[in-house]
């Protein structure tokens, strides 16, 4: 399902509100993913995965940067995320289901920090946005 103008506006407005804290929330979502879905740790065996570790924060910032790029380039997600898709599919060989798990944990994290803003409309728009991001990231797997 395509992102409507309202979806785009809601996602962009939330991203603007998150500001410089995007990396904090993506790091928390990554930590939440590791706790809730321990199999996702498989791809990070070379990192210190303890909560708050500098390595998890660094990867959380990479996730934040990728999502911020996606928000900026909503009209061309497959092209904007093609290098990341190739990296995850061909070099890192990450199971694309892990992207869905991280997306779910990001929704939970954002809802926890912004309960007053997290309306059903915003949740639906973010879910659609993350679905499009996940689809773009999984494109090299086909």
Curated annotation (Swiss-Prot):
Q: Which family does it belong to?
A: Belongs to the globin family.
| Any one GO cellular component localisation term in the record | hemoglobin complex
Gene3D superfamilies referenced in this protein's UniProt entry, alphabetically: Globins
Disulphide linkage map = none
Q: Per the UniProt entry, what species is this protein from, by scientific name?
A: Pongo pygmaeus (Bornean orangutan)
- State the name under which the record lists this protein: Hemoglobin subunit theta-1
Give an example GO molecular function. heme binding
Q: Does the keyword NAD apply?
A: no
The organism that produces this protein has a lineage beginning with: Eukaryota, Metazoa, Chordata, Craniata, Vertebrata
Give the keywords, sorted: Heme, Iron, Metal-binding, Oxygen transport, Transport
Source superkingdom: Eukaryota
Q: Which residues hold heme b?
A: 59, 88
Its GO biological process annotations read:
hydrogen peroxide catabolic process
